C-alpha cells in the first residue's frame, strides 16, 4: 500500500512535462541536476538555525538592545487564582460583563478585581519589548544576508534580464553550487520559522503566517525537485528585497527612534508594493503561467506550482491592505499602532499606576513610542 502511494506520488506525469522522466534528470557528463533527496539536509540545518538564533539573540541582539536602552519592563503579575485561571485557559481571555459577575461570585472578588486580574494575566502573556527586538534583529540579519546572497546568485544570469530564458531547455537544466546552497539555506530558514512559530511573538495574522510559511516551504521544495530552480531563485530574491527593511523598521521602533522607523517604513511600503503587487504578478507570475505553455502542454506540476503562487499572492494583497491602511493613518496623523499589534493594556484602577510606576500617567507603550508597536508580517 505504502509503496503504491510512493510510486503514485513520484509518477512523472504529475511533476514533469509529457515524454520526460526522472531518468532525464540523472547526473551525467559532469552535469548535476536537482534531486528530492537533496532536501533532507534542510531539517538538520533548520535545527542548526535555531541553535545559531539562540546564541545570536543572547550574545548579539541582547547587548545591542542594552546599548539602545531597551530593557525588560516590570509587569504586575496576576495573583494565583484557580477559578480565574481555569476560565482564562478554557473559556477566554476577555470575559463579558455577565461572565465577570459570575466569576466575581465564584472567586469572592469584586468585579473590578476580576477585571484587573484578567488585564494583568493578559499582559503576562504578551511578549516584552526586548523579546520583540531580539526576534526582529535575528530576522533582519538573515533577510539582509539572504537578499545580498540571492542577488549575487542571479544577477549574472541571463534569465535575470530575459525571463523567457528561465524556461530555455527546461527541465534539462543543471544546477550549480550557489543555487544549491541558496535553496537549502532559504528552505532551512523557513523550516526554522515554522518550528519556532509557537514561541515567537504572536501577531493578529498568526494563521496567515502559518499559511505563508507552509506555502513557501511547499513552493521551494517543489521548485527544487521539479527543476523550477531558475524561477525559484528569482522569487526568493524578490521576497527578501523588502523583508529586511521591515525588520529594521521594527528594530528602530523598539529603540524609540521614531523618525528613523517611520522613514524606513515608508521605503519598505514602497518596495513591498512594487515587488509584491507589480513585479511578482506581472513579471514573475506571467513568466510561470504563460511561457511554459509555449514549450509543453499544461500538467499537474504546472497547476500545482502556480496555485501555490496564487496563495502567496493573496497573502501579499492582504498584507498590502494593512500596509496601505497604516500608511494612510500615518500620513493623516492618526496612526497609533501597527494594524497587527497586540497592544499592552494599562492599569486603570485607583492606586495601580502608583504601584506600577510611582504615580506616572498610563502609557500605551513601553519607551513611549506609539508608531508601529508591533511588526507588520509577512511573513511575512
Curated annotation (Swiss-Prot):
PROSITE patterns tied to this protein: TLC
- CDD domains named in the record: homeodomain (cd00086)
Swiss-Prot/TrEMBL catalytic activity: a very long-chain fatty acyl-CoA + a sphingoid base = an N-(very-long-chain fatty acyl)-sphingoid base + CoA + H(+); docosanoyl-CoA + sphinganine = N-docosanoylsphinganine + CoA + H(+); tetracosanoyl-CoA + sphinganine = N-tetracosanoylsphinganine + CoA + H(+); hexacosanoyl-CoA + sphinganine = N-hexacosanoylsphinganine + CoA + H(+)
Q: Where is this region: Disordered?
A: 338-380
The protein's matches in SMART domains, at most eight in alphabetical order, are given as: TLC (SM00724)
Q: In which tissues is it expressed?
A: Expressed in kidney, liver, brain, heart, placenta and lung.
Q: What is this protein called?
A: Ceramide synthase 2
Record's comment on post-translational modification = Acetylated. Deacetylation by SIRT3 increases enzyme activity and promotes mitochondrial ceramide accumulation.
Regions crossing the membrane: 41-61, 140-160, 181-201, 209-229, 264-284, 304-324
Q: Is Oxidoreductase one of the keywords?
A: no
Predominant place of localization: endoplasmic reticulum
Motif Last loop motif: which residue numbers?
A: 291-300
Superkingdom of the organism of origin:
Eukaryota
Please indicate if the UniProt record lists Lipid biosynthesis as a keyword.
Answer: yes
Q: Which GO terms describe its cellular component?
A: endoplasmic reticulum; endoplasmic reticulum membrane; membrane
The upper taxonomy is: Eukaryota, Metazoa, Chordata, Craniata, Vertebrata
What organism is recorded for this protein? Homo sapiens (Human)
Q: Where in the cell is it found?
A: Endoplasmic reticulum membrane
Q: Which Gene3D superfamilies match?
A: Homeodomain-like
Biased composition of type Acidic residues is found at 344-353
Amino acid at each position: 500500500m505504502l509503496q503504491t502511494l510512493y510510486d503514485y506520488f513520484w509518477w512523472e506525469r504529475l511533476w514533469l512535462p509529457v515524454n520526460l522522466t526522472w531518468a532525464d534528470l540523472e547526473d551525467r557528463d559532469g552535469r548535476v541536476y536537482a534531486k528530492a533527496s537533496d532536501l533532507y539536509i534542510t531539517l538538520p540545518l533548520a535545527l542548526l538555525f535555531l541553535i545559531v538564533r539562540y546564541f545570536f539573540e543572547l550574545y548579539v541582539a541582547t547587548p545591542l538592545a542594552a546599548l539602545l536602552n531597551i530593557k525588560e519592563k516590570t509587569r504586575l503579575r496576576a495573583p494565583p487564582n484557580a477559578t480565574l485561571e481555569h476560565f482564562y485557559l478554557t473559556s477566554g481571555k476577555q470575559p463579558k460583563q455577565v461572565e465577570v459577575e459570575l466569576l466575581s461570585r465564584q472567586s469572592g472578588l469584586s468585579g473590578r478585581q476580576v477585571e484587573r486580574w484578567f488585564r494583568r494575566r493578559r499582559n503576562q502573556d504578551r511578549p516584552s519589548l526586548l523579546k520583540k527586538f531580539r526576534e526582529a534583529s535575528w530576522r533582519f540579519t538573515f533577510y539582509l544576508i539572504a537578499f545580498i546572497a540571492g542577488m549575487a546568485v542571479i544577477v549574472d544570469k541571463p534569465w535575470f534580464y530575459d525571463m523567457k530564458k528561465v524556461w530555455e531547455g527546461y527541465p534539462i537544466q543543471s544546477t550549480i553550487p550557489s543555487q544549491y546552497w541558496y535553496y537549502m539555506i532559504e528552505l532551512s530558514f523557513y523550516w526554522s520559522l515554522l518550528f519556532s512559530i509557537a514561541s515567537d511573538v504572536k501577531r493578529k495574522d498568526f494563521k496567515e503566517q502559518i499559511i505563508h510559511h507552509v506555502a513557501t516551504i511547499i513552493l521551494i521544495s517543489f521548485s527544487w525537485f521539479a527543476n523550477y530552480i531558475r524561477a525559484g531563485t528569482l522569487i526568493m530574491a524578490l521576497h527578501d528585497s523588502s523583508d529586511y527593511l521591515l525588520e529594521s523598521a521594527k528594530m528602530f521602533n523598539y529603540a524609540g527612534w521614531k523618525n528613523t522607523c517611520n522613514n524606513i517604513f515608508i521605503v519598505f511600503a514602497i518596495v513591498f508594493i512594487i515587488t509584491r503587487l507589480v513585479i511578482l504578478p506581472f513579471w514573475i507570475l506571467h513568466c510561470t503561467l504563460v511561457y511554459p505553455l509555449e514549450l509543453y502542454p499544461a500538467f499537474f506540476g504546472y497547476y500545482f506550482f502556480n496555485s501555490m503562487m496564487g496563495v502567496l499572492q493573496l497573502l501579499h494583497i492582504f498584507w498590502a491592505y494593512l500596509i496601505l491602511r497604516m500608511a494612510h493613518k500615518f500620513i493623516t496623523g492618526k496612526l497609533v499602532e501597527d494594524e497587527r499589534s497586540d497592544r499592552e493594556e494599562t492599569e486603570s484602577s485607583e492606586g495601580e499606576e502608583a504601584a506600577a510606576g510611582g504615580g506616572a500617567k498610563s502609557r500605551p507603550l513601553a519607551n513611549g513610542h506609539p508608531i508601529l508597536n508591533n511588526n507588520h508580517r509577512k511573513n511575512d
